[in-house]
Design a protein with these regions (language model features):
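Well-ordered, non-membrane alpha-helical segments in soluble/globular domains
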Residues: 30-40, 69-83, 123-124, 168-183
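Short, flexible, basic/aromatic active-site loop/helix in glycosyltransferases
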Residues: 44, 48-58, 62, 69-95
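C-terminal catalytic/acceptor-binding lobe
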Residues: 119-222
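Active-site nucleotide-sugar/metal-binding loop of Leloir-type enzymes
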Residues: 2-15
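Aromatic-glycine-rich donor-binding/catalytic loop that engages nucleotide-sugar donors
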Residues: 62-63, 85-120, 131-138
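Conserved donor-nucleotide/metal-binding helix-loop-beta segment in metal-dependent transferases, i.e.
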Residues: 25-56
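Short beta-strand-to-loop acidic/aromatic patch adjacent to the donor-nucleotide binding site
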Residues: 13-24
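Short, high-confidence coil segments that cap the C-terminus of an alpha-helix
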Residues: 12-14, 44-50, 149
Length: 222
């Protein structure tokens, strides 16, 4: 996102969008475009993000099973929602797109967010918004805080159909995704302990291992 955002800035565009190439459904990109357009047409703030929520995530293996949630997404969303619940005092499942590779945002928002690398990119975007605009930690972006940050999660009609990649790939995704929550200043010590246990239980981390810190790219505009 950081490199793509820089190219968009140089071309003076208002939006930047991302898609993943592992969806086997014909016409998937056309649906993404309509979802992004719908989200931005609803936005009242110039600082807006649209994240695709999959209707189903079936895998291609020996047989077809239409699973509602991806395994990594289910775990990531659990801890994203735990952070929100902890800060608000209300249990919630509102955050459903913690690992949404298909997403778009206005350049006004894109240029003030820090980014992580690899599979930590999408969770870090949300964590960056929580930290900078959650109303608890101080922010250096007063104009954006005044306008408000809008995040739209829009569900597809088509499923996200892709091949089964195995447990090793899931572990490779889970570790960086949860690490951004683990090291966030926004999370509580209790959530930090839960994440550590989760990664050990999922086989993504050995009991004696330290969770690696994600590499964070600073905002393109301070």
């Amino acid at each position: 996102p950081a490199a793509s955002g820089l190219l968009v800035m140089l071309n003076k565009k208002d939006y930047v969008a991302f898609i993943e190439s592992d969806n086997y459904i014909p016409g998937a990109v056309w649906e993404y475009v309509k979802i992004y357009a719908a989200g931005f047409s609803l936005a009242q703030s110039p600082y807006a993000m649209v994240r695709v929520l999959w209707h189903y995530k079936p895998k291609i293996s020996r047989e077809m099973y239409f699973k509602r949630w991806g395994r990594v997404s289910e775990i990531t969303n659990k801890y994203m929602n735990a952070i929100i619940s902890d800060k608000t005092g209300f249990e919630t499942e509102i955050r459903k797109t913690g690992n949404a590779g298909e997403h778009a945002m206005t350049m006004k928002l894109a240029e003030i967010l820090p980014y992580a690398s690899g599979f930590a990119v999408e969770p870090q975007e949300l964590i960056s918004i929580f930290e900078n605009f959650g109303g608890i930690l101080p922010t250096s972006h007063q104009a954006a805080a005044k306008e408000g940050i809008e995040i739209f999660q829009i569900e597809t009609r088509n499923p996200h159909l892709h091949e089964e990649r195995g447990r090793m790939h899931l572990r490779q995704m889970l570790l960086p995704g949860l690490s951004v929550i683990y090291y966030s200043a926004f999370r509580s010590p209790e959530i930090r302990e839960q994440i550590s246990k989760e990664m050990i239980d999922q086989g993504a981390l050995q009991p004696t291992e330290e969770i690696p810190k994600p590499y964070i790219v600073p905002p393109q505009k301070d």
